[in-house]
Curated annotation (Swiss-Prot):
Disulfide bonds: none annotated. Its main location: mitochondrion. It is found in: Mitochondrion matrix. Its EC number is 1.3.8.8. The modification N6-acetyllysine is found at K42, K66, K81, K92, K95, K254, K279, K318, K322, K358. This is Long-chain specific acyl-CoA dehydrogenase, mitochondrial. Long-chain specific acyl-CoA dehydrogenase is one of the acyl-CoA dehydrogenases that catalyze the first step of mitochondrial fatty acid beta-oxidation, an aerobic process breaking down fatty acids into acetyl-CoA and allowing the production of energy from fats. It comes from Homo sapiens (Human). FAD binds at residues 170-179, 203-205, 317, 328, 385-389, 414-416. Residues 1-30 form a transit peptide.
Length: 430
């Protein structure tokens, strides 16, 4: 895996010679000297400070950080105005090996592990550029296809997706069904060996740019429970009856295209069914822990970014004849923020280790998502406050981070639902 990561890093760095080997870190997959860990680091976003990562991961992280600095940050304001990113950046990300990082090499990936995928999630959060929907495409859509798709589906979609030529989305939410997934109305009825799909979806990330969409639909109205009558379908752009509605005007995530999708008598071949008929709800439940862990990791990474942005600001902003950082109330607030962030980072890193070992359960993933996204919003509020009036100005990065944070407790299952699921495991544990 180390060699594959180095090859992936060199794609981004544009080099031809492997970087010098660094001393190995003491972590779950390499021995050696102990790392500083986040609380002792000069900056929470420093490279080489967390025990779950190896020296090869650090090299890969440097290359990913370079990609976001050079290919994403300079264009993000332009994408915010357009309401979507360019297809060009998707293909650039594909060429650099940043899409489907943990996909096997023969399918176009670099064969990395979960930690490698997490590096891409985290570095996008550190860039404060929420536009590219890489994490949804790679961490969610591609996972469904590789884990539950047929060999033909995997060969057809995955190489194009890792190349950034086929953009993926997943369509669960409907105008009348959000967290209540069992209340969906979109349906697919059999017609010979084909399926006829009808319905609509809303709040679909990557919706406008999507080339393939995983659509959640009811396929058995007579099932003993709605959960036993749901299936997943792969709907491709250009299919007759597949209509992309308006891009939704959101409070945050300005550069991330979010759309309404409509399905009007779409005739789907049997090969469009993802996995087995009526097993869709089971697949969703199996994939949700990773989606919620992804949200948690992005949330704590965004919190680390906001803290560093604010630390820098208060150290140079002057008031009452000295920098704001010299005020005791500001110092105490910074101390609180760093403590909360470091404690949460330790928990999320533990969840990453559990998931890499295939031991992350649903309730723990819910705790990570709930806690980290709540913290992200709390940190955003306090960091804007510490910026004063300038924190309310759109040209300041903290303002963008503030509005982007608000959706985190909502998608992936609202935090109210997270508490329900956590409580259910506590009360009804057998």
């Amino acid at each position: 895996m180390a060699a594959r990561l180095l090859r992936g890093s060199l794609r981004v760095l544009g080099g031809h010679r492997a970087p010098r080997q660094l001393p190995a870190a003491r972590c779950s997959h390499s021995g050696g000297e102990e790392r500083l860990e986040t609380p002792s680091a000069k900056k929470l976003t420093d490279i080489g400070i967390r025990r779950i990562f190896s020296p090869e991961h650090d090299i890969f992280r440097k290359s990913v950080r370079k990609f976001f600095q050079e290919e994403v940050i300079p264009h993000h304001s332009e994408w915010e105005k357009a309401g979507e990113v360019s297809r060009e950046v998707w293909e650039k990300a594909g060429k650099q090996g940043l899409l489907g990082v943990n996909i096997a090499e023969h399918l176009g990936g670099i064969g990395g592990d979960l930690y490698s995928a997490a590096i891409v999630w985290e570095e996008q959060a550190y860039s404060n550029c929420s536009g590219p929907g890489f994490s949804i495409h790679s961490g969610i859509v591609m996972s469904y296809i590789t884990n539950h798709g047929s060999e033909e589906q995997i060969k057809h979609f995955i190489p194009q997706m890792t190349a950034g030529k086929c953009i993926g989305a997943i369509a669960m939410t409907e105008p009348g069904a959000g967290s209540d997934l069992q209340g969906i109305k979109t349906n697919a009825k059999k017609d010979g060996s084909d399926w006829i799909l009808n319905g609509s979806k809303v709040f679909i990330s990557n919706g406008s740019l999507s080339d393939v969409v995983i659509v959640v639909a009811v396929t058995n109205h007579e099932a003993p429970s709605p959960a036993h009558g749901i299936s997943l379908f792969l709907v491709e752009n250009g299919m007759k009856g597949f209509i992309k509605g308006r891009k939704l005007h959101k409070m945050g995530l300005k550069a991330q295209d979010t759309a309404e999708l409509f399905f009007e008598d779409i005739r789907l071949p049997a090969s469009a069914l993802l996995g087995e008929e009526n097993k869709g709800f089971y697949y969703i439940m199996k994939e949700l822990p990773q989606e919620r862990l992804l949200i948690a990791d992005v949330a704590i990474s965004a919190s680390e970014f906001m803290f560093e942005e604010t630390r820098n600001y208060v150290k140079q902003r002057k008031a009452f004849g000295k920098t704001v950082a010299h005020l005791q109330t500001v110092q105490h607030k910074l101390a609180e923020l760093k403590t909360h962030i470091c404690v949460t980072r330790a928990f999320v890193d533990n969840c990453l280790q559990l998931h890499e070992a295939k031991r992350l359960d649903s309730a723990t993933a819910c705790m990570a998502k709930y806690w980290a996204s709540e913290l992200q919003n709390s940190v955003a509020y306090d960091c804007v406050q510490l910026h004063g009036g300038w924190g309310y100005m759109w040209e300041y990065p903290i303002a963008k981070a503030y509005v982007d944070a608000r959706v985190q407790p909502i998608y992936g299952g609202t935090n109210e639902i997270m508490k329900e699921l956590i409580a259910r495991e506590i009360v009804f544990d057998k």
